Amino acid sequence: MGQDREAMEHDCKFNTRLLHGETSKGYGQREILPPISQVSAFQYESMEELERVFTHKSMGYAYTRIGNPSVSAFEQKINELEGGAGAVCCSSGMSAITASLLAICESGDEIIAGTGLYGGTIDLLHDLEKLGIHTIFTKKLDKTSLTGLITDRTRVIFGELISNPSLIVMDVKEVSEAAHEAGIPLLIDSTTATPYMARPIELGADIVIHSTSKYINGGGNSIGGIIVDGGKFSWNFEKHTALKEFKKYGRMAFSVRLRTDIWENLGSCMAPMNAYLSYIGVETLGLRMEKICDNADALAKALDKEPDIEVNYLTLPGHPYHGYVDSQLGGHGGGILNFRAGSRERAFKIINSLKYAVIASNIGDLRTLVIHPASTLYLRSGREETEAAGVFDDTVRVSVGIEDKEDLINDFLSAVADSRI
């Protein structure tokens, strides 16, 4: 049976692997789903036993801030989906990005990042400047730009696989090759792609981050983040001095420092209930993403026929990153599209006229969500920085849900038509 299961895990498709993989074999009392360990601490029969857990001589849990069975089950599930060597859950996607960068960088170090990042991530990178960690932004992450930007202080290349909301697609193979030639790891936020569309570690990335609050959870009922370490990067401990103390762990030095030092001391733990809710949510990821991507494609093509609407979606034939849909994203365009309405006033009018789109700041929900990003998500960013991220005063971002696509199309086309009056 063990050999049969191993063969199945290599040969089966996404949804089967998701439901019947290594992490779905049952738990302590043979539960189908991991139970919720909603506790602060764990008890032991003797002080010696607890000491062995604290000194990592025995497996076990002591305090939920540093480990919890419900959270571990979710970590293992996502780690398996991404093909990683280890994963750490965090309280949010922003917490995951923060912990990852602080585990690699220290004062005086540099990060190279794409400009098309989520507004909150840009704000974080500016905050890290106050700690002496400098970010060099580049309009396009590719081999040519990296060659001219990498210095002896560069410690990590960071970007989104599909940027939100500008929909710039990173060529992971090209960027990872350029990074590795310089002895630098590639850290990717793959929230908008999800493991359904792409597995960045297989493409060459070293570390993958998700805001699990989005597509992985899928129901908009919990906040969380996760960091997956591919365990393949050969760290130069003379260059990456933040990891020098963890040299004995070799290629897993990042993961060990992350879990036992930065993550633990920042208090970045995921709540057990949130882990449980996201574990349930991720099991329908394939079904949801198939429907979401189909809806987004249909809605984008319908809106693209409107003469006074400028639509941005990856499957549109003229899109500059259209080629990556098949080569890197499994034939899918994802769940986000955006369009320019011509003015801020018209953008607001369209948003306010929609019947089946909820005005909210999340993405990846079952419901279609809509927002004016310039006045919300990029409120703290300057105009130049906001426009570099592909966000303009007339931009409307749409996170497409699983509604019937005919209803969505009719709703958006009606709102666009009404906005002309």
What is each of the regions a protein language model found here?
Residues 1-60:
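N-terminal glycine-rich, Lys/His-bearing helix-loop that initiates the first secondary-structure elements
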Residues 2, 12, 85, 126-127, ...:
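PLP-dependent enzyme catalytic core of the Aspartate aminotransferase-like
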Residues 2, 6-10, 15-27, 87-306:
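Conserved PLP-enzyme active-site core in the AAT-like
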Residues 9-15, 21, 69, 364-365, ...:
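Positively charged, small/polar-rich N-terminal and surface patches that mediate targeting and assembly
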Residues 41, 229-233, 341-345:
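Short loop segments at secondary-structure junctions
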Residues 41, 46-98, 120-127:
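Conserved N-terminal alpha-helix of the aminotransferase class I/II PLP-enzyme fold
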Residues 59, 85, 223, 274, ...:
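Short amphipathic alpha-helical segments
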Residues 304, 310-396, 400:
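Conserved C-terminal alpha-helix-loop-beta "cap" of PLP-dependent enzymes
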